[in-house]
A protein has these predicted regions:
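The feature marks helicase ATPase cores and/or their adjacent C-terminal helical subdomains
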Residues: 1-465
Length: 465
């Protein structure tokens, strides 16, 4: 059994001191000047969260801190762990540091930069399941649940549909062995049998992988010690988006009182988009008590900051920076509209922009752009109450297509790159677009398999591979 070793904990990080020279070094690379508040965050190596308001440069600070740590990192088999809910953190490092030796070092062993799901898959669930005799074939919620759904007898599917259930019922929910069907009988047994057979064939949903991670951490104390010795420092980016179950897993993997791992969360509790959905939350877990705070937003001035503070979750108050438009005292605007006028809202917003700024100003700041932002992109009428309107961006703009909205699409699976490639070919008729997306996917696959940035991102993905 792996034994707890204090010398493998956070005490060994005391030899890493971030100095003014280190700060000057990273400023020269990033072309960014850090003030005293930001330097304090860069130098801090305690288990403290960073509450960063919009436009405060949180990502820049995190990337800078990682670069300094990677430069000074003395350990061969223990690394820095960076967790997020998307691949944005990794992409930022690839974008800003990917062509430097430090960037390449950060993106390879012994360090890990990835999503919360991929971390627990890689270091906990996959080894645990393999030790129990499972071979892993596929990890994908939609595909796996759909496959299980068609494993059910036709009569059972028909019965479930009449009870407003679909393939989403074909996965463990909240606990291993628990599904969203309480009634005992054949229907429940058919569902459980389908899940069991599917798992024996190596097919799991994303949530099931987290449930098996919890099972492993509950049973194996040596696993917890091993994770802490493997990663003496952990950063959680966009920490406000971590839900209660993920927080529980992180606390089991890196117990706060163990003194074996430093854990720092970076985020803004006022921007919690994904966390606690459908949860009865009594206490917000981020930031923890005594956070380091970045109050100054470089995104807008004090008039907007003061307005936003009135509806903010954070006890700390945000402050803005005066800009060239501050003296105009442009009115804050809220649109009230009837259901039949929804499609006019974007036009009205566009007119407001044209009335507020001159053509010269719009041209000067065209790089920043004017944007319409919404949370719900994909139309799912069957799951949304009819009385709820608007349901998403598509109700404001009839021609909206969700998969075109993200210019920097980075799917998690190779097949998704191929699907995008095929769709773009059909739309444009350009084979070069098809080849570009296929090459992007292959590059991502190679780097993911190697767990390092073997193939660098370039303007010509085909040439790069």
């Amino acid at each position: 059994m792996l034994q707890r070793n204090e010398n493998m904990g956070i005490k060994r990080l005391e030899q890493i001191q971030i100095t003014d020279e280190d700060v000057a070094w990273i400023e020269s690379i990033l072309g960014f000047q850090f003030d005293d508040d930001r330097i304090k965050i860069l130098k801090n190596l305690e288990s403290r969260d960073v509450q960063a308001f919009p436009g405060s440069g949180k990502t820049t600070i995190l990337v800078a801190k990682l670069a300094i740590l990677a430069k000074k990192w003395p350990y061969v088999n223990s690394g820095i762990c960076v967790l997020s809910h998307t691949n944005v953190a990794r992409e930022e490092i690839e974008d800003r540091l990917g062509n430097t030796d430090i960037g390449k070092k950060l993106l390879s062993y012994p360090h890990f930069i990835g999503t919360v799901h991929s971390f627990f898959d890689t270091f906990v669930a996959l080894p645990w399941l393999r030790s129990k005799g499972y071979s892993i074939n596929l990890i994908d919620s939609d595909l796996v649940k759909k496959s299980r759904w068609f494993m059910l007898p036709f009569g059972t599917r028909d019965f479930l549909e009449r009870n407003h259930k679909d393939e989403q019922i074909c996965g463990y929910n909240g606990s291993i062995g628990l599904i969203q069907w309480d009634k005992e009988g054949k229907t429940k047994q058919y569902i459980l049998d389908a899940i069991n057979k599917s798992q024996k064939n190596g097919n799991f949903t994303f949530d099931e992988m987290l449930l098996y991670s919890k099972q492993a951490l509950d049973i194996s104390e040596s696993l917890t010690i091993g994770l802490q010795q493997r990663f003496p420092i952990v950063f959680v980016d966009e920490a406000q988006d971590t839900n209660s179950f993920q927080l529980e897993l992180l606390s089991k993997a890196f117990p706060p009182k163990s003194n074996l791992t430093i854990v720092q969360g970076f985020g803004d509790c006022n921007q919690a988009i994904y966390n606690y959905v459908n949860e009865a939350v009594e206490k917000i877990e981020f930031p923890r008590e005594g956070p380091l705070v970045l109050k100054e937003s470089q995104r807008f001035d004090n008039r907007i900051a003061k307005l936003a503070n009135t509806v903010a979750v954070s006890a700390d108050q945000m402050c803005g920076i005066e800009n060239v438009f501050s003296e105009r005292k442009i009115d804050h605007t809220i649109y009230l509209f009837s259901k039949d006028k929804a499609k006019e809202v974007i036009d009205q917003f566009g007119q407001l922009v044209l009335d507020t700024f001159s053509d010269e100003e719009l041209l000067k700041y065209s790089k920043n752009g004017c944007h319409v932002v919404g949370m719900v992109h994909v139309k799912k009428d069957e799951l949304t109450p009819e009385k709820q309107f608007p349901k998403g961006i598509f109700d404001y703009w009839k021609g909206y297509e969700a998969d075109k909205a993200n210019k920097n699409q980075n799917p998690n699976h190779l097949i998704e790159y191929f699907r995008i490639a095929h769709k773009r070919l059909k739309e444009s008729g350009e084979m070069s677009v098809f080849v570009e997306w296929c090459a992007k996917g292959i590059r991502r696959l190679i780097n993911k398999a190697a767990n390092q940035n073997l193939v660098e991102a370039t303007n010509n993905p085909l040439k790069s591979i």
